[in-house]
């Protein structure tokens, strides 16, 4: 069978031309050879960690109907008797090819992309919840999975590969979705997974240190995030103007053919670039308790107040970002506020367990220096409020932190994590996170380099660390279990073992409870 090649990297018309050259009926595209079924069309890209062209014999054996393969540095073997097409730069073209094959699903969805170091998951989930409350069926794709609020399926990556992403959008469109919100990770943006998707709204939460093992520098990391805001056809850019990158982007986008909604609490009017395409959502009078966040908002000379049953100071920024995204989605301010009042806490994001006659235990995904600083600062402020109202057995309540760092990731942040934990918590236990292929003890030692004081100890076994932290706490204390959030596995030496911080916490609290006590949360 004849093999054809293409060197062009152009628009969707070229994608259609490529599929026509293949001369087979493409019903189901797959880029992951492990998921191939008879009749599928296989896209064999040359990835950074895995070259899928090595899987071509396996794909043929599985009964695929054709193969599109990366042409550069590879030759098709004559014994492979199957329709095929060699394409130079296939990773860049994959999303456009898949979009063409699945009927350009993003054109028929209001597509919202959320990027930033922290807050992507919470913002995407809350946007989907709020839109659902407004009667607009909205799908969501991200760290917690993909699907619809309350019915998510596990995801291997925060941002799926370009082919699977187009398939998911087509499925959600078929299921009646009118909108889709997704987390746009820096890896996904750098690896062209979003090409072929037509975004209506792009949202920036923040930019702090993370993934420097991949991006090498903060400038490269910021550049990856910024790509989303220069997306062809983008209608709205929602920017955090309390962030340096947000201000820079607002200045670069001023006068462009799109609308900007800047948001913030720190007088964003003063930092915003004056331009006809920019509006400001300003939050003020922020108040929070252990149960609720409240603040006032101003937008285009309209005023409203928002109270929401979530906790954590940084969640105020998440709420403001989601409100701005709803406004960009043509939702009236009052309707958006009403919908946001109904959002629910996200699993593993400031998830509260215990309380009552037991210590309060918070499970959170915070795994970057900035996120840990924000969470501990907020909990410290909450604890201070508790101390003002009452004393616990004549002694002040404590803030206890269990934290670790992942293996095979940015080593430079490890001592920073240790420093922040030791400065803001009364007791710290440094433990394992996902050690992956590293020795957990070595990771802990690097975290401990930044920690100081006798209140900082270590425990390699994460379960033992959680037990020790909660057993050492009393009624009125707060215990933060940070780093893994709602993850349901722990990766050790290339294997993933079932593990859930929340289940461990529930078991400890159950063991501690007397016959008359019930675990709360």
Swiss-Prot record:
Sequence positions bearing N6-carboxylysine: 225
Gene Ontology CC: cytoplasm
Transmembrane regions listed in the UniProt entry: none
Binding site for ATP: 116-122
Catalyzed reaction equations: UDP-N-acetyl-alpha-D-muramoyl-L-alanyl-D-glutamate + meso-2,6-diaminopimelate + ATP = UDP-N-acetyl-alpha-D-muramoyl-L-alanyl-gamma-D-glutamyl-meso-2,6-diaminopimelate + ADP + phosphate + H(+)
Record keyword Transferase present: no
Enzyme Commission number, as recorded: 6.3.2.13
GO MF annotation list: ATP binding; magnesium ion binding; UDP-N-acetylmuramoylalanyl-D-glutamate-2,6-diaminopimelate ligase activity
Localization, UniProt: Cytoplasm
Motif (Meso-diaminopimelate recognition motif): 433-436
Pathway(s) the chain acts in: Cell wall biogenesis; peptidoglycan biosynthesis
Entry binding sites for meso-2,6-diaminopimelate: 409, 433-436, 483, 487
BP GO terms, sorted: cell division; cell wall organization; peptidoglycan biosynthetic process; regulation of cell shape
Requisite cofactors: Mg(2+)
Entry-linked InterPro entries: Mur-like_cat_sf, Mur_ligase_C, Mur_ligase_C_dom_sf, Mur_ligase_cen, MurE/MurF_N, UDP-N-AcMur-Glu-dNH2Pim_ligase
UniProt key word Metal-binding: no
PANTHER family attached to this UniProt entry: MUR LIGASE FAMILY MEMBER, UDP-N-ACETYLMURAMOYL-L-ALANYL-D-GLUTAMATE--2,6-DIAMINOPIMELATE LIGASE MURE HOMOLOG, CHLOROPLASTIC
The protein's name in its UniProt record: UDP-N-acetylmuramoyl-L-alanyl-D-glutamate--2,6-diaminopimelate ligase
Species: Nitrosomonas europaea (strain ATCC 19718 / CIP 103999 / KCTC 2705 / NBRC 14298)
Gene this protein is translated from: murE
